[in-house]
Amino acid sequence: METKDRGYFAPANAREWFERRSYSHKEFKDVAKLARRKRELGLTVSLVLPSRNVADTVGGIVEEATALNEEAPLVDQILVIDADSADGTAEVAAARGAEVYSENELLSHYGDAHGKGDAMWRSLSVARGDLVMFADADTKDFLPQFVYGTLGPIISVPSVRFVKGAFRRPFKSSEGLELDGGGRVTELTTKPLFNLFYPELTGFVQPLAGEFVADKELFSSIPFLTGYAVETGIMIDVYKKVGLEAMAQVDLGTRQNRHQPLFDLGKMSYAVLRAVARRLREDGRLRQVRDPSTPDSLFQFSDYLHAVATPEGLKLREHVEELVERPPIAEVLAGSRD
């Protein structure tokens, strides 16, 4: 399948963008051709895997990326940013040839890392590639197309600076496999919020996908929210920075990763909601959402209360998480050189 260079355009809405900026991994299956184009452009690529207790999957992902490189040199650096996992994640990744760092050793003067988003932000301090691609480290049956498909549009189409992976998300339960039952936070929280407040972004099939790539200059110019708010914040901030015309998505097929308990999905949804509300507040589109005399849930610690019925009776569980925003890494690294 021949890739169409759809060039620069200013989309009038999400529908037009969807038609012009949606690709398939099949368009880039000629990996030798893609690698030649990468070489002609003088580009280097860092693949970053934020990891926490994924010893059962991270090794296979590193092996797949390495094997793809033997066929076509698309990835110049494989980085695993480990959350001091207790299951040997770091050792497994290092044994497969990845460059491994503890998330807490990078930019350590910022204190201990606050979850996935912080690990991704800190990775930019050691990522050497002109392009930085992130991928989830808990993906089962990781396929080469997750790498070359994600990289395809940003290497092949000059006006594209950000690419988001898209895929079907199966959900496996005791009743069998539901082909599109995964991605519950995306379907029940993110997409309704984007339809309401950021309709330009509603053409993205998987806005929270962990597989995405941008040029390092772009990633370095935007702030990163910590924890599970990171993907939502990046989507909004990239859109505001470069516009919809520089963003694309690519169909990667089917992907299956770990499924979170319902309570954890609630916390993830809360993080997405806080990220959207925070950006709306900064843009002057949202007033204070709590009593002014109480701590601001968008900028400080916030209690997430979860009432449940259990065999032992009714329980009120509490989760406290700080929503931290790290500054653009370019500012941090520039300051360290002064």
Where are the model-predicted features located?
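A conserved acidic beta->alpha catalytic loop
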Residues: 82-90
